């Protein structure tokens, strides 16, 4: 059967299932696809298809992630589900699967477990803006008081990590019961089965509670410089991929990073050897810049809307350190370690001044496979912002991946 083409006339949102191992994330993901497939708005995916998540590489790290897509009447969704806990950590820190919101799956029979907390913390640290809770396996629990207790505990937990615990929607249901109903009759519609209805209820909550993200083109202009050359008689051209926003001829832009910030005017925009009036997010473009010499600008600088991004040398980061098997270090490192930090298009040397274990407790050294918070000082200022991803490299190979959690100076 030919796959129907998804129409792009609905807003697009990226979400994912998070939560403790065996609480039912993958089963719920399968139930959502099968439920919405009955409306012709998804390709039904079985548990095994999702569970056998393919490997992909992000920033030099291998991660297993399953991607499914579906739509509700309101929106088009891309949904990620990871088989293993380590895959979540890597996925969220590398930003391989950017999430605009998450469905936190919690088994009512267990309540919040260690990875439930860890995933909420991770979501907070890497900037997942909103969470909707699916209280799963309620078919195995007919104690209303106990369910209310679990909900209360979850709301308090979410609040303690700065999410809006009081107002987050918590939907009760059973991914397995919904999946069985849909498997038994793939044409089951809303109103036919109480468990399937819970899936619709969950998707209504996701539709209404998780805000539509601002599109990249609507954000302030930013392009990381990849290459620079001069065109005789015309001036200096900086090339790169426009990360966000738009740029038009005669726009004023700032050149940020490595040296003092300078202002220049865009006098020409080229793409594939053709001139354009405007470049936008996703374009690989060359920008002709007024009054700059080739030596004034270098790879690793960014061109940005004035005032939208500033250069910094010191930041705190949330980091995953690769294991030896993943191509990382074989030995631990200590405070004072000086690797390269690869940000956008360039490596900058920096010193890891201090670090703590992820829960804030002291750590003497960092072992391959650890997740830590670190304080970094770079030798040159570069354009940095909260939520930005970076890789840590040594001799050209990636030994860690991180996200900026706070700018220090």
UniProtKB/Swiss-Prot annotation:
Keyword Hydrolase on entry: yes
Record region (G4): 136-139
Catalytic activity: GTP + H2O = GDP + phosphate + H(+)
Region ranges (G5): 174-176
Cellular compartment(s): Cytoplasm
Keywords: Cytoplasm, Elongation factor, GTP-binding, Hydrolase, Magnesium, Metal-binding, Nucleotide-binding, Protein biosynthesis
Residue span, tr-type G domain: 10-214
Residues engaged in binding Mg(2+): 26
Region ranges (G3): 81-84
Residues where GTP binds: 19-26, 81-85, 136-139
Top-rank lineage group of the source organism: Bacteria
EC supergroup of this enzyme: hydrolase
Listed GO CC annotations: cytosol
Region annotated G1, chain positions: 19-26
Single GO term (MF): translation elongation factor activity
Region ranges (G2): 60-64
PANTHER family xref list: ELONGATION FACTOR TU, MITOCHONDRIAL, ELONGATION FACTOR TU-RELATED
Subunit structure: Monomer.
NCBIfam families hit by this protein: EF-Tu, PRK00049.1, PRK12735.1, PRK12736.1, small_GTP
Protein family (similarity comment): Belongs to the TRAFAC class translation factor GTPase superfamily. Classic translation factor GTPase family. EF-Tu/EF-1A subfamily.
Function of the molecule: GTP hydrolase that promotes the GTP-dependent binding of aminoacyl-tRNA to the A-site of ribosomes during protein biosynthesis.
Protein name: Elongation factor Tu
Organism: Cyanothece sp. (strain PCC 7425 / ATCC 29141)
């Amino acid at each position: 059967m030919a796959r129907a083409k998804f129409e792009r006339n609905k807003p697009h949102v990226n979400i994912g299932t998070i939560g403790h191992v065996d609480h039912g994330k993958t089963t719920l993901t399968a139930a959502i696809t099968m439920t919405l497939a009955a409306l012709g708005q998804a390709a039904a995916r079985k548990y095994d298809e999702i569970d056998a998540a393919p490997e992909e590489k992000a920033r030099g790290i291998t991660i297993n992630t399953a991607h499914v897509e579906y739509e509700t009447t309101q929106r088009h969704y891309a949904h990620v589900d990871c088989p293993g806990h380590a895959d979540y950590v890597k996925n969220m820190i590398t930003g391989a699967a950017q999430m605009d919101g998450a469905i936190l799956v919690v088994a009512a029979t267990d309540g919040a477990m260690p990875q439930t907390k860890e995933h909420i913390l991770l979501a907070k640290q890497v900037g997942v803006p909103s969470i909707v809770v699916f209280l799963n396996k309620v078919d195995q629990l007919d104690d209303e008081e106990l369910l209310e207790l679990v909900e209360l505990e979850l709301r308090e937990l979410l609040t303690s990590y700065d999410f809006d615990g009081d107002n987050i929607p918590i939907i009760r249901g059973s991914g397995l019961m919904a999946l069985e109903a849909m498997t038994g009759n793939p044409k089951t519609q809303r109103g036919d089965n109480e468990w399937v209805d819970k899936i619709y209820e969950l998707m209504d909550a996701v539709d209404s509670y998780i805000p539509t993200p601002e599109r990249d083109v609507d954000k302030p202009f930013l392009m990381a410089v990849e290459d620079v050359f001069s065109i005789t008689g015309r001036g200096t051209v900086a090339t790169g991929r426009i990360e966000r926003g738009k740029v038009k001829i005669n726009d004023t832009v700032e050149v940020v990073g490595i040296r003092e910030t300078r202002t220049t005017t865009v006098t020409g925009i080229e793409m594939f050897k053709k001139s354009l009036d405007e470049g936008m997010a996703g374009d690989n473009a060359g920008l002709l810049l007024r009054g700059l010499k080739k030596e004034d600008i270098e790879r690793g600088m960014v061109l940005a809307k004035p005032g939208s991004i500033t250069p910094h040398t010191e930041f705190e980061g949330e980091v995953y350190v690769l294991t030896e098997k993943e191509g990382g270090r074989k030995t631990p490192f200590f405070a004072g370690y000086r690797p390269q930090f690869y940000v956008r298009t360039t490596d900058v040397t920096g010193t890891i001044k201090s670090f703590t274990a992820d829960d804030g407790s002291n750590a003497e050294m960092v072992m391959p496979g650890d997740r830590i918070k670190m304080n970094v000082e770079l030798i040159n200022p570069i354009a940095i912002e909260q939520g930005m991803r970076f890789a840590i490299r040594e001799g050209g190979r990636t030994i860690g991946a991180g996200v900026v959690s706070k700018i220090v100076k």
